[in-house]
Amino acid sequence: MASPLLQGKLHISGMDSCAPALARQWQLGLETIAFSYAPLLDDPAALPRTREEIHGISSLWFHGPFAELIPCAIDPLARDVAMRRFRQALDAAQALSIRRMVFHGGFIPHVYFPEWYVEQSVWFWREFLRDVPADMTLALENVMEPSPETLVSIAAQIDDPRLGLCLDVGHANTCVSETPPMDWIVPMAPWLRHVHLHNNQGDTDLHAPLGEGNIPMRQIIDTVLHAAPEATFTIENQNALPSLHWLAAQGSIEEPT
C-alpha cells in the first residue's frame, strides 16, 4: 500500500547546504540548523542571515543547540548553561516566526541513570515551558536513549500540549539503541510531533540517504502516518537529493515540474 503524499508534511534539514533552495524547488518545508551550534546565538549577524535563508518557506522547524547542553546534568551550573542557551534559541525562533522547535533529550548512557534522566528532565522542561508561548511546539529528540520509555515518561509526566517528542529513526537504529526503530513508534505516538528520517546499517550514525541502509523506511513512514497522523518529517542528509528522488519513486512526494 503506497504512503499518502508527504508534500505538506516533509521538511529538509539545513545540514544540506542546499536545503533552502531544495525546499523551494520541491515545495517542501525546512528545518533550520542555523543555531544548532550554540555560539552562533551570540552572533548578531546570524539572525538576519537566517531570516534571509528561510524567506518564502512557509513550513519551518527550528533545531535547537545541543553540544554540551544537558538538561539532566548533575552539576546545576551545567544545567544553567543549557537553560540559558535554550532560552536564547527560543528567542531566536520567535524572532524568525518559527513556532516549532526540536531539542535533544540529552541522555548519555553510563553517565546518567534513566530514573535521574527522567526526574531532572521533567523539572528542567517544566521550568523552560514557563517562557514558551501557548502556540509553540517543542519536540524532544532521541539520540542515545536505548528505548523510547524515558522520553515517553518525560512527556507523560509533564503533560503539556506544548511539549511532544521527535523520533529520530536513524538514532533508533544505532549501536546505542536496544529497540528496533519500528518499536519506537507506537509508544511515542501520543506525543509524536516530528520524525527525523535518515538511514544506516545498524551501527554508526551515518545519516545516509533513505534508500541506503537496513531501516525499513517505507514501513516506518506508513506506520507513523497511521499512528501519529499529525506528525511531520525531516530528511536529515548532507545531500538530501537522493532521498527526495527515493521518496518520489515511492509516490510519497511529487517531483518538481
Question: Where are each of the predicted segments found?
Answer:
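Histidine-acidic metal/acid-base catalytic patches
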Residues: M1-G8, C18-A23, Q88, R99, ...
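N-terminal pre-domain/capping segments
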Residues: M1-Q88, T257
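Acidic-and-aromatic substrate-binding clefts and catalytic sites of carbohydrate-active enzymes
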Residues: S13-A21, A34-P48, I70-A73, P109-F113, ...
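Hydrophobic "anchor" residues on beta-strands that sit immediately upstream
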Residues: Q27, S59, T137, G164, ...
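Conserved, mostly hydrophobic/aromatic
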Residues: L30, H63, A82, A93, ...
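Alpha-helix-loop-beta-strand connector modules within alpha/beta enzyme cores
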Residues: T50-A67, S121-D135, M217-V224, P229
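Short loop/turn segments at strand-loop or loop-helix junctions that form parts
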Residues: H63-A67, F103-F107, H198-N200
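Active-site acidic/histidine proton-transfer and metal-coordination neighborhood
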Residues: C72-G164
